[in-house]
Amino acid sequence: MPADRLTTLEIRAAEQERTIEELSGQIAEQWTVIERMQRKLDALTDRFLALEEQAAPDVPVTKPPHW
């Protein structure tokens, strides 16, 4: 294998390795953001359900007046 071809392959391999490392870092950051957003969504859902329970009083089951 000629030296220049080997050098080209080594350069490509190094570039691909760098790209993979960058993408891996970006994925890790995205997962951190996703986990934080999921926690916020869970907290907001809990707050919403609590407010919904407070706002909607229990409606008693009664028969209409014509019964």
Swiss-Prot record:
Endpoints of the signal sequence: none
Matches recorded under Pfam families: SlyX
UniProt cross-references to InterPro entries, sorted A to Z: SlyX (IPR007236)
Stated family: Belongs to the SlyX family.
Protein name: Protein SlyX homolog
Gene: slyX
